[in-house]
Regions:
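N-terminal beta1-alpha1 ligand-phosphate binding loop
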Residues: 2-30
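Generic secondary-structure signature for well-ordered alpha-helical cores
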Residues: 25-32, 78, 102-106, 137-141, ...
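A short beta-strand-loop structural module common to alpha/beta enzyme folds
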Residues: 33-42
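Cysteine-cluster motifs in flexible loop/terminal segments that predominantly coordinate metals
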Residues: 42-73, 199-204
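Helix-loop-strand module that forms the ligand-binding subsite of alpha/beta enzymes
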Residues: 60-148
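Glycine-rich phosphate/pyrophosphate-binding loop and the adjoining helix
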Residues: 142-204
């Protein structure tokens, strides 16, 4: 079994990396493979609502980051997304790539356990955490929890190492993800068959 970790920070080895690495160590102790993808610091193309992904089965913008994540999703069993907190929300570049991934790759995501992690200096983590969870809860994905909301605190690179409670929350998240994955693996025949999708709006 394998879990994809997405580091949504522009800083490759900053506090978001520290938080996700703590989750990764807990997963590996449970014999779960991990892969971490860093979104980097380059500009990320957002969704333009062209709906070409409905025809192509993938986003019309074929950049390296999108292709790398999409390819990884074909052989992962779970996903954990980490972000720094900007104005009580996730990194905008992370949301740009997630909008495209979740809209064009829903068939690669449904029924895979997922979790989000927010890293902040002081406040805004819960709002960013909730925002990321919206991707999962609209995609038929079980959301894995921990002993507290999944946040770690730190400003300068490395400060997250001082957040003993935050790091414990990350380890608990890793163990809980492993537990969910193992239970799903032994009960794959119980995964529900979705109904045909209905789409309505509020205009009469």
């Amino acid at each position: 079994m394998k879990v994809l970790l997405i580091n949504g920070s522009p800083h490759k080895e900053g506090n978001t990396f520290i938080a996700l690495s703590e989750v990764a160590k807990a997963l590996e102790k449970e014999s779960i493979q991990v892969e971490m993808i860093h979104i980097g610091s380059k500009a990320v193309q957002g969704c333009i609502a062209c709906y070409k992904c409905f025809e192509l089965g993938k986003c019309i913008f074929q950049d390296d980051l999108y292709n790398k994540i999409r390819e990884s999703l074909t052989n992962t069993d779970g996903i954990i997304i980490g972000t720094p907190v900007y104005y009580a929300g996730p990194n905008g570049s992370l949301c740009a790539i997630l909008d495209r991934i979740f809209y064009s790759c829903s068939h690669l995501l449904q029924y895979k356990p997922a979790a989000s992690v927010a890293v902040c200096r002081r406040g805004g983590a819960s709002a960013a955490f909730d925002r990321l969870n919206k991707y999962f809860t609209i995609s038929n994905m079980p959301v894995v929890s921990s002993q507290y909301w999944n946040s770690v605190h730190g400003l300068s690179p490395g400060e997250a190492l001082k957040d003993a409670e935050g790091l414990q929350i990350m380890r608990t998240l890793g163990r809980n993800m492993a537990w969910v994955l193992k239970n799903l693996k032994s009960n794959t025949e119980l995964i529900p068959m979705p109904e045909e999708r209905q789409s309505t709006n509020f205009i009469r």
